[in-house]
């Protein structure tokens, strides 16, 4: 809990320092690896990967600003993936709204389509060529 609080405080400090930055332009497009999150849904999936006899591999967000698409990808080595596609809307200089459009859980020889329900938003409070810090 103490480390979590320190990380959130650091993110909030970055948000204040970067409040005038534009982080929703073309430089937001790319494949971003998640290193830390407070997202309950992602944490639940990560925690319960052992249900499938595996552990979590990469957790990625693939953002395409030009085509207004967002893909959330959680890999389960050696051949599994949970994939959620979303449409996005640039709402402000730092805020992106998204709406889920499709979801699938895929293994080596099987695939389960899931209903894509939900929507949300995130604000990229810091962005450079290597690091993106977002909050929601």
Where in this protein do the model-derived segments appear?
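Soluble ligand-binding/transfer domains with enclosed cavities or grooves
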Residues: 1-136
